[in-house]
């Protein structure tokens, strides 16, 4: 009797060891892709809090330019962030709202004069002031998730220095002579003579303050990092510094200050070339009807370690390409832009060895034996995900939304 019990136990032990070496149940690639496509269908509707796709309406002959501008700015901003994370091997914040956020664009009032106007005679060589009217968003102040200030740096071939460190400040309302007049936000090193580029700054705190206290909205100041004095150790002298002029030029801010009143041709050319590049704010807000879901529907992501920044072996867990065409794969015509996107998915084997130092290895093996359909051993899953910006129509109303965690960028065994 004891011999039979012992034999049965040894057999069970060998079976569980064999099972513990396996990974998730394997799927053929076609089936895996079909499941991924259906998951994306449900994911998009869920993030938009829709139970079914909007009714099909005839596509508009022409999308309003301001709508396209918001869509392009949001898409470009996300691409810039993704490039920076890839270069530095970083991750986004661990807490990211699961549901889609509405995106609003607020342009800075144009400083370019009309054709017959005389350009302003004053010029601030050491800094620039940028102001925005956010009063229209005050009713949604509590829904603000993020605010980005974007300004396009122009190429300045006549710059006296090739590189400058520019700083962004929030202008403060002075209570008295001793109170600060500005608050530092961020800085960037720019190449003054290089091709133009978009610069982005996180100004969430400043805009949040403006939405709650309208009288504190005095705008932003772009200036140089310039210490007021230099200490000379050899003779203990303190030499006052002459302020360095701001050589960086910005679309929508600079352009008329150096022109004469007769240079109307240059003004016209500048206006046309820099069209769509004026400074603006991108505000991302969680709609009120999704605010309640924000607390209970967040997805947490692990921090990306340097160990994960490697090239996966093709046979093992790695990133697999998958392009989703909204019309072909989902049968949807209501998403205007983009027409599709690279969703990708994770697949491949995850080696899993029996280890005596695994605290619950025997428990997990027994669990596998009792429930072979479930997986207690590592599976190939998504690690880094990026958001997707879409432009769609509900009826004849255009809407722009940012959908988080839609693009799989890397995988891991977990």
Swiss-Prot record:
Glycosylation sites: 72, 140, 241
Signal peptide from the UniProt entry: 1-20
One Gene Ontology biological process: hair follicle development
GO molecular function: amyloid-beta binding; cytokine activity; growth factor activity; protein homodimerization activity; signaling receptor binding; transforming growth factor beta receptor binding; type II transforming growth factor beta receptor binding; type III transforming growth factor beta receptor binding
Keywords for the protein's UniProt record, in alphabetical order: Cleavage on pair of basic residues, Disulfide bond, Extracellular matrix, Glycoprotein, Growth factor, Mitogen, Secreted, Signal
Gene3D superfamilies: 2.60.120.970, Cystine-knot cytokines (2.10.90.10)
GO CC, any one term: extracellular space
Cysteine disulfide links: 309-318, 317-380, 346-411, 350-413
InterPro entries in the record: Cystine-knot_cytokine, TGF-b_C, TGF-b_propeptide, TGF-beta, TGF-beta-rel, TGFb2, TGFb_CS
One Pfam family, short name: TGF_beta
Subunit structure of this chain's protein: Interacts with the serine proteases, HTRA1 and HTRA3. Interacts with ASPN. Interacts with MFAP5.
PANTHER family recorded: TGF-BETA FAMILY, TRANSFORMING GROWTH FACTOR BETA-2 PROPROTEIN
Family designation: Belongs to the TGF-beta family.
Name the UniProt record assigns to this protein: Transforming growth factor beta-2 proprotein
Gene assigned in the entry: TGFB2
